[in-house]
Amino acid sequence: GLPFVGTGWYRLRFEVPERNEGRRCTLLFDGAMSHARVYVNGQEAIRWPNGYNSFHTDITPLLNPGGENLLAVRLENLPESSRWYPGAGIYRNVHLIVTDEAHVPVWGTQIITRRADEASARVRQCTALTVPQGKSPADYAIETAVTDPAGRIVARHRQSAGADFGDHCFEQEFTIDRPALWSPDTPALYTSTSEIYEGGELKDRYVTVFGIRTVEAVQGEGFRLNGKPLKFRGVCLHHDLGPLGGIVNESAIRHRIRLLKEMGCNAIRTSHNMPAPELIEICDETGMMVMAESFDEWETKKVENGYHKEFGQWAERDLVNLVRRFRNNPSVVMWCIGNEVPDQWNGDRGPKLSLRLQNICHREDPTRPVTQGMDAPDAVTANNMAAVMDIPGFNYRPHLYARNYLRLPQEMILGSETASTISSRGIYKFPVVRRSMPRYDDHQASSYDVEHCGWSNLPEDDFIQHDDRPYCMGEFVWTGFDYLGEPTPYYSDWPSHSSLFGIIDLAGIPKDRYWLYRSKWNSEAETLHILPHWNWKGREGEVTPVFIYTNYPEAELFINGRSQGRRRKDTGVTIDNSADSVSAADLKRQRRYRLMWMDTRYEPGTVKAVAYDEEGNAVAEREIRTAGEPYRIVLEADRTVIAADGKDYAFVTVRVEDRQGTPCPLADNEIRFEVTGAGYYRAGANGNPASLEPFQRPRMKLFSGMMTAVIAPTERPGTITVKATSPGLKKATVEIRSEAATQP
């Protein structure tokens, strides 16, 4: 990945008004990497080892009203503390929250959908209240108004604290007629605004965004959302944003979620840590379900300075903060307490720790099921570690699902981590055969999507499980995007620096595998994708297989106008008649989900696919062709209007075409960027897992004919002009307009 070990200090001087009496000041960190120690005027306010978690502290007693104050934050990343690139420093946002002494504390509301259908919903809100010393809760009242997605008030309730004001918590219930239920297809969000009064004086206003929906795991049936069965079409995501590193950025997250939604993905697993609040809020808005994960280690180490050193003292506090932070977010549909923890082999210790952590989740949030990703299915069914979970999650080894299902009282299995197929965008290896842990001199993997790791498999090995086994609840593929670090199977081999697992590469450009998943997961959009590219000088006359990924059942392939035959997806392939090693080597399961012409021979020209529907009607076609010499650069911005706020990035896809407009798949020209006007070049990436070109430098080589440039606005509205040049190529320019940012 990138260097991350070391110690850093942040210091901020600020003034506090002299008349600060009766006010409370709280610092909220969304995440600080890692081992944070926070000091105010030389006194330690709080420490928090976990670099991913949110934490907060009241700094009022440490302030110097009417004078200068010094906030200092010390962070330290230890060597051998992470299995992937964690980032470093204050990489998430920090908030100063100023309230009256009587106020709703941080994460002080909990909104639960007690029941919901299309006719009505019953919603309960619990609102905590912190009162000044010497005051009685009975002196206060709460008034809450609930507004629907259109901003209309649909419920209102006023309540005074009574003698039974347990734990300083107001409980209010609302009936909402004809509610808009939250789901991946209808991500409707409601807003609760609670006002705290002392007599007639407003003391605090607290806003909570929530969704009306129910979730449940039903024995023998699986997961239900709003009472309806649902299977997960999910991906695992590490938190880094490729060339931007670990720093959180809303526009980059939105860009990623948009690509995943278009693929048909409906869920994300935040592997293997607490997520950024921005990710969860965007998932709320866009209808992306979330498995919110906590730990990669419990008591037993994976790396020398990992979380196992903090688990005993900090696990409950970390888990409580995770749940309280996100318990009102409708996108979060389950909690995940661990990933492949070695404790699963430690006798009865694994089951006991599982139950302890799950019970903490249930105590803090009784509405969501709890899972964990276990990669030793035989062991965890034998020692009952899987049996104690609300939802047993298995990482890999789908061939062991059937026998372990018989030992599970829940009668369901979640593919909590699947596939780990490896590929490099635009790179193809011959001959086309299934390979485990292949290693090539160029440190790449084949985009024919037939290569995987020693513990993993190909996408269809999971597809067929979830299609043919009713007890399978769906899957979370490793991974949605390539990420910094873990370049398996090359491990520490120089110059490998990023993973090959992603369905989408580090530059945010879809690999061929994207279209395979899209053909399976997105039934609303047409998919018809041909691979490989058709520039194979030197392979004339040699066998060069052609694959088609499509959601149509049949297609015909033409090379230079000559039919290579029609292929139909083989629905006669089942999980039971394709489980042997001969079938695996023969790509038998792949025939059910992709169309393959294994004996086609290369000749320059055109490759065309014609797709047919179930009735045999030709309904779509696509053509690729052999490209000529690179001629011009093409720039395409994902958006042409962005906010002038310094952080609303535009993502510009860069490619090279020949004179006829055909993309050049082998182009590796170095592209130089010049950005003028109201913006600047923020970063770039080409998706090459073995490239050490700096992300921030405004020049980079194309990889397989493409790259992405990230353009940032200043805080001054205006026009941003991006110019790309390369010797011997026709230059390209794109303009992006940045407009004054609107205040929330």
Where are these regions (language model features)?
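Short flexible loop/turn segments that cap and initiate beta-strands
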Residues: P137-E143, D185-Y190, N551, L557-R568, ...
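Non-catalytic, glycine-rich low-complexity segments
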Residues: G1-P17, L28-D30, E68-S136, P149, ...
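Short, hydrophobic beta-strand segments
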Residues: I59-P61, Q172-W182, L595-R601, Q696-E715
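Accessory beta-strand-rich segments of carbohydrate-active enzymes
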Residues: G1-Q110, P149, V209, M274-P275, ...
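Beta-strand-rich structural segments
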Residues: Q125-L129, T193-E195, V546-T550, V610-A611, ...
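Extended acidic/polar, glycine-enriched regions
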Residues: N64-G66, T127-V218, W597-G605, D613-E614, ...
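Extended substrate-binding grooves/exosites of carbohydrate-active enzymes
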Residues: Q43, W48, N93, E101-H103, ...
